[in-house]
């Protein structure tokens, strides 16, 4: 499944809760129908996908990533993630699949973030909030580990694209991933050709 993980700006090998969460998710594996195991999660990291000269603004780009994701995890650890939290909580579809990891700090009890988007999310689903007292506590938190595993291994239903005129991006990603899994190593041209033949699409 696709998990959009938001948090402090991504820096390789930096010890942040976001990086730790991504590493934890990547360790989750599930058995497939071919007698082997696959990674259960593909973590979406916006900074690794957004191209600076892309005509689309980064807010709209992240909104698209949120829409195609099965779950959204927001680690509230930077001003940018506070903006993402507010935007995603105000969107009904994003809100229902969002989990927030937030610092349990008395100084923030009356902040806008706590009284606004976090309170709204908590009123709809109390289990969608994980409070912490730092990375080391997160590493030893039974609640954190349980909820992350639950997200990684939740049942998944994917709609099938059967109309070349209205291909859904999320379904397309999963369908192409299945082709790669079955036929790898495979090149882009081969993937596209296989997809169109399997679907009986002239184009999409």
Question: Where in the sequence are the language-model features?
Answer:
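Long, low-complexity, charged/polar intrinsically disordered regions in eukaryotic proteins
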Residues: 116-168
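Basic/polar, acidic-poor N-terminal "presequence/leader" segments
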Residues: 1-23, 183-186
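Cross-kingdom TIR/SEFIR domain
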Residues: 84-131
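Donor nucleotide-activated moiety binding/catalytic core segment of transferases
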Residues: 55-72
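Short, aromatic/basic amphipathic alpha-helical patches
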Residues: 15-29, 110-123
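Conserved BB-loop
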Residues: 30-59
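Short amphipathic alpha-helical interface segments
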Residues: 165-203
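Short acidic, S/G/P-rich loop/turn micro-motifs used as interaction or catalytic elements
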Residues: 9-16, 48-52, 74, 78-81, ...
